[in-house]
Structure formats: C-alpha cells, structure tokens
C-alpha cells in the first residue's frame, strides 16, 4: 500500500489526511507525520498503519491531557478518568501518563500539597473532609498523611472557629446550649474532630452571656405567643413552652422568665 497524497486539514492545520492508493485512509498529528517520515510514495504495510494509528491516538490524547491540565493541576487519577471519558484505549492512557510524568506534568505529592493548602485557605474545611477528597482523587494514604500534617492544630482551630461564627449567625434564635450543639454537629460534618469542634463552639459562643440569652428568649416568647394566640390559654402556654424547649431553653428557665416578667396566657378582658 502506497501513500498517494497528503493534505492539511482545513479546520486543524496541525493534522494531516493520509491517502493510500488514491483513497483517504487515516489522519495524523504533525508530530506523528514527522516521526514516521510519512510522505507521498512511501509504502506501508497493515502493521505499519496500525502502529501509526496507535501513535496518533497517544499524541491526540496527550494534547487533550495537556489542555485539560492547563486549567488547573490534576492528580493522576483525574487525568486517567478524563482520558477514559475521551474514549482512549487503555494502552494509550498508560503511554500518555508516562509521557506526562516524564514532562513533569504529573506529581501527585505536589498536587496533594497544593490542593490541601488551597482548601485550608479558601474553604475552611476540616482535615477529615480534605482527606476524603484526596482519597477520591486517587492519592495514596502515604501522600495524604504527609500533606495533612501541614494542617496545624492552630490553623484547624482558627478555621473551625470561623465556621462556628458563621453557624452562630445563622442560628441566632436558639439558646446557647442548643447553639453549641448545632455548631459541634455541623463542624464534625465539615471534617473536624469532635474535640476540636467542642473547642471552637466554646470559643465562638464565649461572649454570649445571660443577658444575651434572656433577650433571645424574650423575642422567641413574643413570637411564639403571637403564633399560638388562636389556641386556648392552657394549650397556647404548652405549645409555647414546647417550642422554646426545642430551641434549647430549659423548662425551668422558661418558667422563671414567665413568672419574673408576669407573662400570662390568659385573654385580656
């Protein structure tokens, strides 16, 4: 089989159409064209053509991978998954990854280190969440352990406290005890240890005093009483107390406040 003509593709000047015996047969990247010295008149066997096509697949995949990496640093697993979605053959994926590694495009430790630092600074995530994300990205336990060590206890407490302050602002209608429990639960879900979550909850709510809680209780009593005024006095009182207890106020605190402020559920005559 002889190459009878070669033409540049109109939409991609770096790719060439190869015609064998006057018929289009395949296309190749410019680098593959030069490597195999493809030119008019060259004779190729079926095995030659198959080898060239495989080399072109690797080259095409390599170009796609480099473009994929141009947006941000990726782990080896992320690149492998991307190439699979591009329907690359397994042999091509392995070859592409080797080439990328030789070109210093892949370094899982550097990726993990950069990813961890970014998450610490920009997302305030806890170490367990970051560890889980690194596992999903295909990093080894050894690499994960090394980079997580850089997340100091001081930085964890600082980030957890910042998260706690945000949680507190969103839940400023609850009693201090309930608020602290909410903070602890949310922080554990965000990847912090229970011990550190408790410390952050204590730190975030440290400035809440009895007066603050009394003010919150007053507002909640007024709001709940308005909501329940359509009920009989005894039912309205019970519903109000139940609602307040669900927000973390103790029964004794509620009763004391009602008594001290002479709040009655009886209808005014």
From Swiss-Prot:
Q: Is Cytoplasm one of the keywords UniProt gives this record? A: yes
Residue ranges of the TM segments: none
Instruction: Name a single GO cellular component.
Output: cytoplasm
Q: Tell me the compartments it is located in.
A: Cytoplasm
Q: Name one Pfam family in it.
A: RecX_HTH1
The alphabetized list of GO BP terms reads:
regulation of DNA repair
**Family, as annotated:** Belongs to the RecX family.
Q: What name does this protein carry?
A: Regulatory protein RecX
Which organism was this protein described from?
Listeria monocytogenes serovar 1/2a (strain ATCC BAA-679 / EGD-e)
């Amino acid at each position: 089989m002889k190459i009878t003509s070669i033409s540049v593709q109109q939409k991609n000047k770096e790719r060439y159409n190869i015609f064998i015996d006057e018929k289009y047969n395949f296309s190749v990247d410019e680098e593959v064209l030069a490597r195999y010295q493809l030119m008019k008149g060259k004779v190729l066997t079926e095995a030659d053509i198959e080898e060239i096509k495989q080399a072109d697949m690797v080259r095409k995949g390599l170009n796609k991978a480099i473009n994929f990496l141009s947006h941000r640093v990726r782990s080896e697993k992320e690149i492998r998954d991307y190439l699979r979605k591009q329907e690359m053959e397994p042999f091509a994926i392995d070859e592409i990854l080797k080439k990328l590694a030789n070109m210093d495009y892949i370094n899982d430790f550097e990726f993990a280190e950069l990813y961890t630092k970014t998450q610490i600074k920009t997302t305030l995530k806890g170490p367990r969440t970051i560890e889980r994300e690194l596992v999903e990205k295909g990093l080894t336990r050894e690499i994960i352990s090394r980079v997580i060590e850089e997340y100091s206890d001081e930085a964890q407490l600082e980030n957890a406290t910042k998260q706690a302050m945000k949680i507190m602002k969103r839940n400023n209608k609850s009693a201090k005890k309930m608020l602290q429990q909410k903070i602890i639960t949310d922080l554990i879900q965000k990847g912090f240890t229970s011990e550190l979550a408790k410390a952050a909850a204590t730190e975030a709510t440290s400035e809440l005093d009895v007066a603050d809680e009394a003010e919150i209780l007053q507002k909640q009593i007024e709001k709940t009483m308005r909501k329940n005024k359509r009920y009989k006095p005894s039912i309205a009182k019970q519903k109000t107390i139940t609602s307040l207890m669900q927000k973390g106020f103790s029964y004794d605190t509620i009763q004391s406040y009602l008594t001290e402020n002479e709040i009655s559920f009886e209808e005014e005559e």
